[in-house]
């Protein structure tokens, strides 16, 4: 398998749809939230974490099955339903509309992979093993995360900062526990 090209896109204020509301869908939503996407989750049953995010106004929740047309106007889609047929229908709609989609149960239908994410302030790194080894990608992302922390701390300890006025040790956007865990 050839490696995927890493690309970083702005999701700020743009619509993203997540089909499904189980553990994988929840991880995907939590990976997308820090990047400003307007996230709609579509699923008949919803996990507690997503319920809470909806109550806090951080995501929009539609408690119903996925239906044709749900991906209209979105810039990014994730299908992580616990139903192969639903995921396949979402893939077909995304493909027809030219919408990038990650399909949790079928890497062949995914047009992108969720990377392991490492973030410290404005520095963001994504790690993938091209869908071949999720554990390797997760471990590599943890190593990159640690390197970024050390890099930022070293710069700050040497007075190199692009953020005057920020309290030492206060780095907005750091990601101590982002797993993003590469998967479809």
Specify the residue positions occupied by each region the protein language model found:
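Adenosine-phosphate binding glycine-rich loop
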Residues: 118-165, 169-171, 177
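Glycine-rich, highly charged phosphate/nucleotide-binding loops
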Residues: 55-69
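Short loop/edge segments at beta-strand edges and connector loops
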Residues: 43, 61-65, 105
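Hydrophobic, well-ordered beta-alpha structural blocks that scaffold small-molecule cofactor pockets
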Residues: 1-54
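Residue-level detector of alpha-helix initiation sites
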Residues: 23-24, 85, 131
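Hydrophobic beta-strand scaffold residues
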Residues: 39, 61, 100-101
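ADP-ribose/adenylate-binding Rossmann-like module
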Residues: 76-81, 87-113
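Intrinsically disordered, low-complexity regions enriched in acidic/Ser/Thr/Pro/Gln residues
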Residues: 149, 181-184
């Amino acid at each position: 398998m050839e490696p995927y090209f890493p690309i970083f896109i702005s999701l700020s204020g743009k619509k993203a749809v997540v089909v499904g509301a189980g553990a994988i869908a929840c991880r995907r939503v939590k990976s997308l939230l820090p990047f400003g996407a307007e996230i709609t989750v579509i699923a008949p049953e919803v996990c507690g974490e997503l319920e809470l995010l909806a109550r806090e106004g951080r995501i929009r929740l539609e408690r119903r099955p996925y239906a044709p047309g749900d991906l209209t106007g979105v810039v990014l889609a994730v299908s992580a339903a616990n139903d192969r047929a639903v995921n396949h229908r979402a893939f077909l709609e995304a493909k027809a509309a030219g919408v990038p989609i990650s399909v949790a149960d079928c890497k062949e239908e995914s047009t992108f992979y969720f990377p392991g994410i490492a973030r410290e302030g404005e520095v963001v790194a994504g790690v993938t093993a091209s869908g071949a080894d999720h554990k390797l990608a997760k471990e590599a992302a943890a190593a990159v995360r640690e390197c970024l922390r050390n890099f930022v701390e070293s710069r700050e300890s040497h007075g190199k900062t692009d953020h005057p006025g920020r309290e030492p040790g206060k780095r907005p956007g750091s990601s101590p526990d982002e797993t993003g865990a590469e998967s479809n």
